[in-house]
Amino acid sequence: MFGLGTMEMVIILVIVLVIFGAGKLPKVMGDMGRGVKSFKKAMNAEDDAPAEPEVSKPAAAESTEKKDA
């Protein structure tokens, strides 16, 4: 996962604990989880939406009939 080993994850966790404190950590993680869930939901909703067919206007085609001069 992102090339992070166990020691790197432990160091990151300790830094997060120092910054936010043990009391706020569950709230911060819950908010982060809701954000990720909302992001995934939005991405799936975009994939589920039917693609609107592209309507191309016909180019100004010249008449194939020969015009009498």
Curated annotation (Swiss-Prot):
Q: Which InterPro entries match?
A: TatA/B/E, TatA/E
Q: Which Gene3D superfamilies match?
A: 1.20.5.3310
Which one of the record's GO molecular function terms can you name?
A: protein transmembrane transporter activity
What are the subcellular locations of this protein?
A: Cell inner membrane
Kindly report the protein's main subcellular placement as a broad class.
membrane
Transmembrane residue ranges: 1-21
* Positions of the UniProt region annotated as Disordered: 44-69
Query: According to its record, how does it sit in the membrane?
Result: Single-pass membrane protein
GO CC terms of this entry: TAT protein transport complex
Q: Which UniProt keywords apply?
A: Cell inner membrane, Cell membrane, Membrane, Protein transport, Translocation, Transmembrane, Transmembrane helix, Transport
GO BP annotation list:
protein transport by the Tat complex
Q: What does this protein do?
A: Part of the twin-arginine translocation (Tat) system that transports large folded proteins containing a characteristic twin-arginine motif in their signal peptide across membranes. TatA could form the protein-conducting channel of the Tat system.
Q: Subunit structure, per the record?
A: The Tat system comprises two distinct complexes: a TatABC complex, containing multiple copies of TatA, TatB and TatC subunits, and a separate TatA complex, containing only TatA subunits. Substrates initially bind to the TatABC complex, which probably triggers association of the separate TatA complex to form the active translocon.
Family to which this protein belongs: Belongs to the TatA/E family.
NCBIfam families the record matches = tatAE (TIGR01411)
Record-given protein name:
Sec-independent protein translocase protein TatA
Q: Which species?
A: Magnetococcus marinus (strain ATCC BAA-1437 / JCM 17883 / MC-1)
Q: Which gene encodes it?
A: tatA
